[in-house]
């Protein structure tokens, strides 16, 4: 049998990435999301919901809360309350959390890649093979800097709370680019995702 014949007769198994797992996750949340503030989801107000769509098909993925001014103020206040304790963990303590976050990204990378592709419209291959490994890598990298902060950056102090706006083109990767260094150095983050890629 030639190589060409082998390729022509190969039986392909199912891809390890499946939309079914992402759909179950969205259904468990009734495809509705409030704001995540202070470690908790806010109540959902139907008047402030907007629709997140799959740009490839126009399909509704979920309905999301558009934050009100009072919710933004609550998020900033929660971040300010949390920041002193986060800073007090020290670089090694913060690094443990960032390493754990990187490992969670790796553990759930297939699900996150499917969600990122559905939300953004980019090919799954790009999310899975490009974005997700870099997301984990950024958290690993900045965890290392957190461990070195005391000796390599003596006298540096956190600024407090960082407000970060994430664009639509690399939502999860941009989150890692912006949040990982801020968190590593002892800051807290209030994040505003793009309305087109909010999941």
Tell me what each language-model feature is.
Residues 37, 72, 76, 161, ...:
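Hydrophobic aliphatic residue packing
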Residues 1-63, 96, 100, 133, ...:
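Terminal low-complexity tails and localization/encapsulation signals of metabolic enzymes
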Residues 54, 66, 193:
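Conserved strand-loop elements at the edges of beta-sheets that form or border functional pockets
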Residues 144, 148-199:
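Conserved small-residue-rich beta-alpha loop and adjacent elements
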Residues 59-149:
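Glycine-rich loop-to-alpha-helix module at the N-terminal edge of alpha/beta enzyme cores
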């Amino acid at each position: 049998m030639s190589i060409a014949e082998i390729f022509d007769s190969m039986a392909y198994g199912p891809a390890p990435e499946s939309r079914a797992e992402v759909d179950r996750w969205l259904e468990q949340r009734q495809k509705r999301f409030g704001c995540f503030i202070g470690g908790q989801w806010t109540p959902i107000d139907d008047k402030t919901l907007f629709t997140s769509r799959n740009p490839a098909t126009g399909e509704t993925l979920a309905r999301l809360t558009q934050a009100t001014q009072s919710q933004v103020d609550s998020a900033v206040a929660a971040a300010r309350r949390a920041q002193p304790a986060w800073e007090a963990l020290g670089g090694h303590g913060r690094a443990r959390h960032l390493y754990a976050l990187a490992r969670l990204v790796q553990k759930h990378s297939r699900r996150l890649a499917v969600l990122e592709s559905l939300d953004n419209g980019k090919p799954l291959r790009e999310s899975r093979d490009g974005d997700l490994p870099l997301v984990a890598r950024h958290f690993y990298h900045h965890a290392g800097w957190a461990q070195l902060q005391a000796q390599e950056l003596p006298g540096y102090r956190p600024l407090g709370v960082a407000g970060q706006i994430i664009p639509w083109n690399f939502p999860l990767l941009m989150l890692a680019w912006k949040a990982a260094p801020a968190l590593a150095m002892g800051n807290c983050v209030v994040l505003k995702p793009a309305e087109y890629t909010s999941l």
